[in-house]
Swiss-Prot record:
Gene Ontology biological process terms, A to Z: RNA decapping
Family: Belongs to the Ap4A hydrolase family.
Protein's UniProt name: Bis(5'-nucleosyl)-tetraphosphatase, symmetrical
PANTHER family linked to this entry: CYTOCHROME C5, PTHR40942
Primary role: Hydrolyzes diadenosine 5',5'''-P1,P4-tetraphosphate to yield ADP.
Catalytic activity, EC: 3.6.1.41
Molecular-function GO terms, alphabetical: bis(5'-nucleosyl)-tetraphosphatase (symmetrical) activity; phosphatase activity
Chain segments annotated as transmembrane: none
Gene Ontology CC: cytoplasm
Pfam families attached to this UniProt entry: Metallophos
Cystines in this chain: none
Catalytic reaction annotation: P(1),P(4)-bis(5'-adenosyl) tetraphosphate + H2O = 2 ADP + 2 H(+)
The species this protein was found in: Coxiella burnetii (strain RSA 493 / Nine Mile phase I)
């Protein structure tokens, strides 16, 4: 399923796909991605692919992953924190040696700017009405219903697509504010929204984020819980498909939530789910962690 095999003839109308497969955090693991597509017998003329963010970094082949995904017909992509990090590095808003990463090939690629432009036009949330499913990288904070979450995600998309996207990205990193208030404005408002959708694991009932803890669900700090334990599945009435939290190993304790990060970049496996049947597919990691 090499990217070069996807041509204009194959980019069929996927308004009514046979199957929609959503794949967990790829993080530059191109080889495993191709093996997973072989396992599910992916047909680009009949099936649609989606990804819950963190397409790049940690694995060895982020450039190949981006080029392949860009070649697909209308993939369902949401951004993760590592994807935003690539945008910040790629546009020269942070020194390349600020943190360890495996993004050097992307940063030196002749088509770097084309890939960055394509990436920054991806949203933080995708709502697939026909499948009653929401795709998001980290999760949905409890104080927002589905409609509100989609509207807040649009604020980030507007900033990323707008003329001042560099200023937005330059000031994106940070843990504060960690508490949502309706009167938040400017960069503080955008940073909270972005952190909630791309970095959140634990929070309290009002959406106060704990961005320091990364462990299993039983390791939550006092008064905090995994975000999905606060949500009401009857109220949401949709499946929430997410990644980001490798320590969950693809397991979520709440109904209608589907965790897909199974730690491929850490040496474990890459996982996909068929949104129609909820059947899961996984392949083991073959790529050694490069950082």
């Amino acid at each position: 399923m090499d990217a070069r095999a996807i041509n204009s003839r194959e980019k069929a109308d996927l308004k009514y796909p046979r199957n929609t497969y959503i794949i967990g955090d790829v993080q530059g693991c191109y080889r495993e991605l191709q093996e997973l597509l072989e396992l599910i017998q992916f047909d680009s003329t009949k099936d649609r692919l989606g990804f819950v963010g963190d397409l790049v970094n940690r694995g060895p082949n982020s450039l190949e992953v981006l080029r392949f995904l860009k070649s697909l017909s209308s993939p369902l992509i949401v951004l993760g924190n590592h994807d935003l990090y690539l945008l910040i590095l790629g546009y020269g808003l942070m020194p390349e040696d600020s943190y360890e990463h495996t993004l050097h090939a992307v940063l030196q690629a002749p088509d770097k700017l084309e890939l960055l432009e394509w990436l920054r036009h991806s949203p933080l949330i995708r709502y697939e009405k026909s499948l009653s499913a929401v795709l998001v990288h980290a999760g949905l904070p409890p104080q927002w219903n589905i409609k509100e979450s989609i509207l807040h995600a649009e604020e980030i998309s507007t900033a990323l697509k707008g003329p001042h996207y560099l200023a937005f990205l330059k000031n994106l990193f940070g843990n504060e504010p960690s508490q949502w208030k309706e009167d938040l404005e400017g960069q503080d408002r955008l940073r909270y929204i972005c952190n909630a959708f791309t970095r959140m694991r634990f929070c309290d009932a009002k959406g106060h984020l704990d961005l320091e803890s990364e462990g299993k669900t039983n390791q939550a700090p006092s008064r905090f819980r995994p975000w999905f334990e606060w949500r009401n599945p009857q109220e949401d009435n949709v499946d929430i498909v997410f990644g980001h939290w490798a320590a969950l190993n693809g397991q979520s304790s709440a109904p209608h939530t589907h965790a897909l990060d199974t730690g491929c970049a850490w040496g474990y496996k890459l996982t996909a789910i068929n949104l129609k049947t909820k059947e899961r597919f996984s392949v083991p990691c073959q790529s050694a962690l490069r950082m």
